[in-house]
Swiss-Prot record:
Keyword check for Cell membrane: yes
Name of the protein described by the UniProt record: Autoinducer 2 import system permease protein LsrC
Keywords: Cell inner membrane, Cell membrane, Membrane, Transmembrane, Transmembrane helix, Transport
Domain of life: Bacteria
Species whose genome carries this gene: Photorhabdus laumondii subsp. laumondii (strain DSM 15139 / CIP 105565 / TT01) (Photorhabdus luminescens subsp. laumondii)
CDD domains referenced in this protein's UniProt entry, alphabetically: TM_PBP1_transp_AraH_like
Lineage of producing organism: Bacteria, Pseudomonadati, Pseudomonadota, Gammaproteobacteria, Enterobacterales
GO molecular function terms attached to this record: transmembrane transporter activity
Compartments it resides in: Cell inner membrane
Length: 333
């Protein structure tokens, strides 16, 4: 039973989502509907993108706490580019390039200079956030064009163009991680770094790619943020990194690396966003969001640690069970 839960964390996250849907449907009978699912999915798109990027980094046994600042900085660059007269496609390209460079910088510091990931990204968190405020002079960016806002406008099945693009990205990343040698390299790097090197995996390159893709996902999150609300506050992205990590852990991504799937992380992001919608339904203040996200993260970490200890204990018992049986039989004879 313990192994079943450990090996199927996506199913447990899905069950949690369905249970929460059931609970909220008791309060409001119209809550459990296709419209609600699409609305929650639309609200979850930013967190899903950040969780997808965080998945790659965490699989390699690293962590990035600067993604919220990267998303905010990229949103600012997006807004400034559009207001400067650049086309939407050029502005998006510049934004994605900036996100990739920011992620690459994090990865280079971690792999080439051997600075611990948590220390590196704590430093760049302040660096990117400060650069964002310097560029805007602490002001909001407003007056964004309608063509940007149309990216998040409902389309077929009440899902926006960005929503459909996101689903394609989810399927592509899930397939790459599960079915390709390149994808399995992320698991090998996080599970056993030295062993992966002996098998020919270019672990430094894999880690840099993980951070770079993480930066691109953060840039996409910044674009989605700008398109959804139509302006860019000076605190855009603040606190999102903790929610992204919480979503990954909730979905079964191990902080020790080498374990988990991107589908699990996405379900975790959906669940956390669903909690937010539940708070709106219950008419609770918005500042409960961070408290609940922190509580869920702590609870999942405790559960994950206890589950891991229980599984290891069970494996040890099975390993030495036959020796104990032999000792007992010798004592009887």
């Amino acid at each position: 039973m313990l192994k079943l839960i450990q090996n199927n964390r996506e199913i447990t996250a899905l069950i949690a989502i369905l249970c929460l849907f059931g609970l909220l449907s008791v309060i409001d009978h119209q809550y459990f509907s296709l419209q609600t699912v699409t609305l929650v999915f639309s609200s979850a798109q930013i967190l899903i993108l950040l969780a997808m990027g965080a998945t790659l980094v965490m699989l390699t046994r690293n962590i990035d706490v600067s993604v919220g600042s990267i998303a905010g900085l990229c949103a600012v660059i997006m807004g400034m580019s559009l207001n400067a007269g650049f086309s939407l496609s050029v502005s998006c390209l510049l934004t994605l390039l900036l996100g990739m460079c920011a992620g690459f910088f994090n990865g280079a510091l971690v792999t080439w200079l051997k600075i611990p990931a948590i220390v590196t990204t704590l430093g760049t968190l302040g660096l990117y956030r400060g650069l964002m405020l310097l560029l805007t002079d602490g002001k909001w960016i407003e007056g964004l064009p309608d063509e940007l806002k149309r990216l998040s406008a409902p389309l077929w099945l009440n899902i926006s163009p960005i929503g459909w693009l996101l689903m394609i990205l989810i399927l592509a990343m899930a397939w790459i991680l599960a079915k390709t040698p390149f994808g399995r390299s992320f698991y090998a790097t996080g599970d056993n770094l030295q062993g992966a090197r002996q098998l020919g995996v270019r672990t430094d390159s894999i880690q840099i790619i993980a951070f770079s893709v993480n930066g691109v996902m953060a840039a996409l999150a910044g674009i989605v943020f700008a398109s959804q609300i139509g302006f860019i506050p000076n605190q855009t992205g603040s606190g999102l990194e903790m929610r992204a990590i919480a979503a990954c852990v909730l979905g079964g991504i191990s902080l020790l690396g080498g374990t988990g799937t991107v589908i699990g992380a996405i379900l975790g992001a959906f669940f956390l966003t669903q909690i937010n919608s539940g708070l709106v339904l219950l008419k609770l203040p918005a500042w409960w969001n961070d408290f609940i996200a922190g509580f869920v993260l702590l609870a999942v970490l405790i559960f994950d640690g206890r589950l891991r200890c229980a599984i290891e204990k069970n494996i040890r018992q099975q390993k030495y069970a036959r020796f104990l049986k032999n000792d007992k039989s010798n004592q009887v004879t």
